[in-house]
Design a protein with these regions (language model features):
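ATP-dependent carboxylate-amine ligase
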Residues: 1-132
């Protein structure tokens, strides 16, 4: 499992650029690609911004955490995302990562605050750094 932390990319164009870069890294082209999206409570406007770029991405699943999960789910569905691809998580823990198929890339976007920091703490505890 590869985890790409783009939580700190504070605007949609930076997130899109990082997405394009990781698509050009061969070992990150895995069988399963998960978008992990974290929203913070004071950034409701990011739901629309992120949904616009997500609709153009290729993914197998979208995991929603943090604030505005249902709003984000509805916005994504209205933009053509299949609702079966969207998973709402109240929290992510080490067991969630342990249950992931090995040939998976998780691309974490949105905001680092709140749930994002919790997820980073888990990844740092159970993972190893390949690229900085």
């Amino acid at each position: 499992v590869y985890f790409v932390n783009a939580f700190a990319a504070n605007d949609p164009s930076s997130t899109a650029r990082i997405y394009e870069k990781i698509n050009n890294i061969s070992f990150l082209r895995t069988q399963c690609f998960v978008l992990l999206v974290n929203n913070r409570p004071d950034r409701a406007y990011r739901v629309e911004q992120l949904s616009m770029i997500i609709r153009d991405m290729k993914y197998d699943e979208i995991w929603l955490v943090g604030s505005y999960k249902k709003l984000m789910r509805n916005k994504l569905i209205s933009k053509g995302v299949k609702k079966e691809a969207i998973k709402i998580h109240e929290r992510i823990n080490a067991r969630d990562f342990a249950e992931i198929e090995r040939d998976t890339t998780i691309f974490a976007i949105g905001n680092v605050a709140g749930k994002g920091n919790e997820i980073i703490d888990i990844v740092e505890r159970i993972g190893e750094l390949l690229v900085q």
